[in-house]
């Protein structure tokens, strides 16, 4: 596992965006051989999306031959709702870059057959071979996507009941009213994430410090689903300074020295 220790949320977003752009450009995608990118929602990736849009407008990257798969979507929330992940992605990213509409894949939380929707999503991912890079965030309790504590580390795309803590955390997007936050969501599984060629998780804020410690210094444990990254051959965790407060000094020093060349120029 790589740990990229940075100072601020802005630096985390810039590093993540630069990493994605470098991966896309090195891949040299075409219509017949697209780059497949997994994407998250929420507050954490906003600085990364902003930086990606800026790099696109500066001519540094094209998304014309990029195919995206989003991590999750609420169940029962109309896609036109301002807090649906469909709306979030278009508002913060898709509407500002040159990605073709047919290359965008989002789970449908209003599908008449939820099980079929989840199966078809997995099959569509497999039809591209694999996701080349999956970017994600992490919850205070260590969940990735909506794989809440005690999720199977072999899980695939499915419906999940959201914990009360997750709904409280997300209520900030629903006028602070937890009762407006949907109780269920569709989410890719831990196994789906582990199938990606590379997984990059962004971690921001002191409230995520225990989750980061569990990921880096703890054991693989389904109560902290972020710890599954230890099983992945190409995992990258990009974090700001407040989120490192639970890490041992020697751990942080080790990764600072290891990644010194890779955190320049931010």
From Swiss-Prot:
Protein name: Glucosamine-6-phosphate deaminase
Record keywords: Allosteric enzyme, Carbohydrate metabolism, Hydrolase
Stated family: Belongs to the glucosamine/galactosamine-6-phosphate isomerase family. NagB subfamily.
Keyword Coiled coil: no
Catalyzed reaction equations: alpha-D-glucosamine 6-phosphate + H2O = beta-D-fructose 6-phosphate + NH4(+)
GO terms classed as biological process: carbohydrate metabolic process; glucosamine catabolic process; N-acetylglucosamine catabolic process; N-acetylneuraminate catabolic process
Matching HAMAP family: GlcN6P_deamin
InterPro entries: Glc/Gal-6P_isomerase, Glucosamine6P_isomerase, Glucosamine6P_isomerase_CS, NagB/RpiA_transferase-like
Activity regulation details: Allosterically activated by N-acetylglucosamine 6-phosphate (GlcNAc6P).
Database matches in NCBIfam families: nagB, PRK00443.1-5
Site, as annotated: Part of the allosteric site: 151, 158, 160-161, 254
Organism for this UniProt entry: Citrobacter koseri (strain ATCC BAA-895 / CDC 4225-83 / SGSC4696)
Active-site residues from the entry: 72, 141, 143, 148
Pfam families cross-referenced by the UniProt entry: Glucosamine_iso (PF01182)
Function recorded in the entry: Catalyzes the reversible isomerization-deamination of glucosamine 6-phosphate (GlcN6P) to form fructose 6-phosphate (Fru6P) and ammonium ion.
One GO cellular component term noted in the UniProt record for this chain: cytoplasm
GO molecular function list: glucosamine-6-phosphate deaminase activity; identical protein binding
Pathway annotation from the record: Amino-sugar metabolism; N-acetylneuraminate degradation; D-fructose 6-phosphate from N-acetylneuraminate: step 5/5
Oligomeric and partner information: Homohexamer.
EC number: 3.5.99.6
Claim: Isomerase is one of the keywords in the record: no
């Amino acid at each position: 596992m790589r740990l990229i220790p940075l100072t601020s949320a802005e630096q985390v977003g810039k590093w993540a965006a630069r990493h994605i752009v470098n991966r896309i450009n090195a891949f040299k995608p075409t219509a017949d051989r697209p780059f497949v990118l997994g994407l998250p929602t929420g507050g954490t990736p906003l600085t990364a999306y902003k930086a990606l849009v800026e790099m696109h407008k500066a001519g540094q990257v094209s998304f014309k031959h990029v195919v995206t798969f989003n991590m999750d979507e609420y169940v029962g929330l109309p896609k036109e709702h301002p807090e649906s992940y469909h709306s979030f992605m278009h508002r913060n990213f898709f509407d500002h870059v040159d990605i073709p509409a047919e290359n965008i894949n989002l789970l449908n939380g209003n599908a008449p057959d939820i099980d079929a929707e989840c199966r078809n999503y997995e099959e569509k991912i497999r039809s591209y071979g694999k996701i080349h890079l999956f970017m994600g965030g992490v919850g205070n309790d260590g969940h990735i996507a909506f794989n809440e504590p005690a999720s199977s580390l072999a899980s695939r795309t499915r419906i999940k009941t959201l914990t009360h803590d997750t709904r409280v955390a997300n209520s900030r997007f629903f006028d602070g009213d937890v009762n407006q936050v949907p109780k269920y969501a569709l989410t890719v599984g831990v196994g789906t994430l582990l199938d990606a060629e590379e997984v990059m998780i962004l971690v921001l804020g002191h409230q995520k410090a225990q989750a980061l410690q569990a990921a880096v210094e703890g054991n693989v444990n389904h109560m902290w689903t972020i710890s599954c990254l230890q099983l992945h051959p190409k995992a990258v965790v990009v974090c700001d300074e407040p989120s490192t407060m639970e890490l041992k000094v020697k751990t942080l020093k080790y990764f600072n020295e290891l990644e010194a060349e890779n955190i320049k120029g931010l």
